[in-house]
UniProtKB/Swiss-Prot annotation:
<dbReference type="InterPro" id="IPR002358">
    <property type="entry name" value="Ribosomal_uL6_CS"/>
</dbReference>
<comment type="function">
    <text>This protein binds to the 23S rRNA, and is important in its secondary structure. It is located near the subunit interface in the base of the L7/L12 stalk, and near the tRNA binding site of the peptidyltransferase center.</text>
</comment>
<keyword id="KW-0699">rRNA-binding</keyword>
<keyword id="KW-0694">RNA-binding</keyword>
<dbReference type="InterPro" id="IPR000702">
    <property type="entry name" value="Ribosomal_uL6-like"/>
</dbReference>
<dbReference type="Pfam" id="PF00347">
    <property type="entry name" value="Ribosomal_L6"/>
</dbReference>
<dbReference type="GO" id="GO:0022625">
    <property type="term" value="C:cytosolic large ribosomal subunit"/>
</dbReference>
<dbReference type="InterPro" id="IPR019906">
    <property type="entry name" value="Ribosomal_uL6_bac-type"/>
</dbReference>
<keyword id="KW-0687">Ribonucleoprotein</keyword>
<comment type="subunit">
    <text>Part of the 50S ribosomal subunit.</text>
</comment>
<dbReference type="GO" id="GO:0002181">
    <property type="term" value="P:cytoplasmic translation"/>
</dbReference>
<dbReference type="InterPro" id="IPR036789">
    <property type="entry name" value="Ribosomal_uL6-like_a/b-dom_sf"/>
</dbReference>
<dbReference type="GO" id="GO:0003735">
    <property type="term" value="F:structural constituent of ribosome"/>
</dbReference>
<dbReference type="GO" id="GO:0019843">
    <property type="term" value="F:rRNA binding"/>
</dbReference>
<dbReference type="InterPro" id="IPR020040">
    <property type="entry name" value="Ribosomal_uL6_a/b-dom"/>
</dbReference>
<protein>
    <recommendedName>
        <fullName>Large ribosomal subunit protein uL6</fullName>
    </recommendedName>
</protein>
<keyword id="KW-0689">Ribosomal protein</keyword>
Length: 178
């Protein structure tokens, strides 16, 4: 039995969960998320908790058991507390500014780089070199953050670029002069 999949998912008050066939819909104070559960896995509600079970011990069932439990747990956390990722910009002249609900970056290119906020994502600019990506879908928050980081990855020689808060950038030693 999967150690993670075996754990029940506590459902806080204010969260409404409906299971219709293979689709799980989670409604909470911050919004609504839904997920289609893969074939062999079954999700049941039982006195204020969700239980994820598998019918057999086939390899596919075992691998999907813990995954499904974690995805549903992330949905419950997302609609109650939400997710956020803080990113920092390091470099002379590198900055970010809010343009309505979107962001505009100056990252050393000859043009500003606009980033539109997808549905369900909210940007918060704290300083010109620090901003936060907020949302209820953990996967979408991570994906948008990774795309923004990919606009100018941290340089291993000078450390310039967009990085996650607390990310350690391994630095290389430059060439030695003669």
């Amino acid at each position: 039995m999967s150690r993670i999949g075996r754990l029940p998912i506590p459902v806080p008050s204010g969260v409404d969960i409906t299971v219709e066939g293979a689709t799980i819909t989670v409604k909470g104070p911050k919004g609504t998320l839904s997920h289609v559960v893969a074939e062999p896995i079954v999700v049941n509600t039982e006195d204020g908790r969700l239980l994820v079970t598998r019918p057999d011990d086939e390899r596919r069932s075992r691998s999907l058991h813990g995954l499904t439990r974690t995805l549903v747990s992330n949905m419950v956390t997302g609609v109650t507390a939400g997710y956020s990722k803080t990113l920092e910009i390091v470099g002379v002249g590198y900055r970010v500014q809010a343009k309505g609900s979107d962001l505009e970056f100056a990252l050393g290119y000859s043009h500003p780089v606009p980033v539109k906020a997808p549905e369900g994502i909210r940007f918060e600019v704290q300083t010109p070199t620090r901003f936060v990506v907020h949302g209820i879908d953990k996967q979408l928050v991570g994906e948008v953050s990774a795309k923004i980081r990919g606009l100018r990855k941290p340089d291993p020689y000078k450390g310039k670029g967009v990085r996650y808060q607390g990310e350690v950038v391994r630095r290389k030693v430059g060439k030695t002069g003669k």
